[in-house]
Amino acid sequence: MALMTVRDIDVKGKRVFVRVDFNVPLEDGRITDDTRIRAAVPTIRYLVEEGAVAVLASHLGRPKGQRNEKYSLAPCARRLSELLGREVVFAPDCIGEEVERLVAEQPPGSVVLLENVRFYAEEEKNDPEFAAKLARLGEIFVNDAFGTAHRAHASTRGVADHMPVRVAGFLMQKEVDIMGKALSDPDRPFVAIIGGAKVSDKIMVIENLLTKVDRLIIGGGMANTFLRARGFATGKSLVEEDRVDTARELLAKGGDKILLPTDLVVASEFKADAEQKVVPVDAIPEGWMALDIGPETARAFADVIRGAHTVVWNGPMGVFEMEPFARGTFAVAQAMADCEGVTIVGGGDSVAAVEAAGLADRMTHVSTGGGASLEFLEGKELPGVACLAVKP
């Protein structure tokens, strides 16, 4: 699906309403990671250079539909101004006559950042009246917030109903193009790596990927449920008892495509300084828990990853936040960095893992969307993408 982008339309002298994703981590009003703001800069800079008035909308945190200065986008306006090297006008609200006047006064080439759209409960309800008020601030709708594309909210979906021209920003285009090609026309062998704690979060992803991949690697806490489905005793490891039958069905459906761990790092307790050892999957001691894949598994997974032409990774191989149980996840990250094919990291924890390993810049693409990436991998239509124009 080739989306139309800002480059395909005339924006000169137009007010362009851009949904960005500035949902950045803050500590005492200070931005601790500006990755998401940086990711939006190419689209904003293009609009400025083409003589548009860029009106930016975003959410930040979960203010629960009430004004809360803790979640103000003011720090984002300051950081964006530094990145662009020009003034960013910060609006005190995201709707209303005062904001409409402020936007109308801006000359071509200006940037306005609206206050947090989630200060209004109507945003997440996709309230038509609220969406119409947002739409008064622009003539063209640009969605550059892949991270919220799976949400049908007023600023991601509702506002589009009021704008005849609806296109993607460069970040949205990149996400949809790269992940879309991986799922619809991958260079093979195509390998997917699925990890994380729960099978229940990833059932639809696994079902969809089994129809597309050559190999599917399963690690993390969810691997325990699959090992239980294979008949292994799993000690005190996290297992979703109500998903064992589902795991068994997926194993039957996937057959030789699915790779499970053959050894594990187990610990006596869920803490970094607990007693730990490496055991085969058929020898987990009673009362112990699996917290990472073992070295034999890490080597086997790495061999498959390095030989792939397309790799998609969603979810860590273990409790990588604790140093003794990070080796499996970091081994996968290193194998992806060594792989000469297309490597895509999608989903919050895997992104944090490649960044912690210092290997993010060696991936073809690190997705900005957690839940959106997951739903994309499930094969679902994303509301924030479905409303955008497609190239003829």
Curated annotation (Swiss-Prot):
Protein name: Phosphoglycerate kinase
Listed pathway(s): Carbohydrate degradation; glycolysis; pyruvate from D-glyceraldehyde 3-phosphate: step 2/5
Residues annotated for ATP binding in this entry: 202, 321, 347-350
Localization, UniProt: Cytoplasm
Keyword ATP-binding part of the UniProt annotation: yes
InterPro entries xrefs: Phosphoglycerate_kinase (IPR001576), Phosphoglycerate_kinase_CS (IPR015911), Phosphoglycerate_kinase_N (IPR015824), Phosphoglycerate_kinase_sf (IPR036043)
Species lineage: Bacteria, Bacillati, Bacillota, Clostridia, Eubacteriales
Binding-site list for substrate: 21-23, 36, 59-62, 118, 151
Keyword Transcription regulation: no
GO molecular function terms noted in the UniProt entry: ADP binding; ATP binding; phosphoglycerate kinase activity
Transmembrane segment boundaries: none
Taxonomic source organism: Symbiobacterium thermophilum (strain DSM 24528 / JCM 14929 / IAM 14863 / T)
Reaction catalyzed: (2R)-3-phosphoglycerate + ATP = (2R)-3-phospho-glyceroyl phosphate + ADP
Main location: cytoplasm
GO terms under biological process: gluconeogenesis; glycolytic process
Enzyme Commission identifier(s): 2.7.2.3
HAMAP family: Phosphoglyc_kinase (MF_00145)
Record keywords: ATP-binding, Cytoplasm, Glycolysis, Kinase, Nucleotide-binding, Transferase
A GO CC term attached to the entry: cytosol
Class of this enzyme: transferase
Oligomeric and partner information: Monomer.
A Pfam family this chain is assigned to: PGK
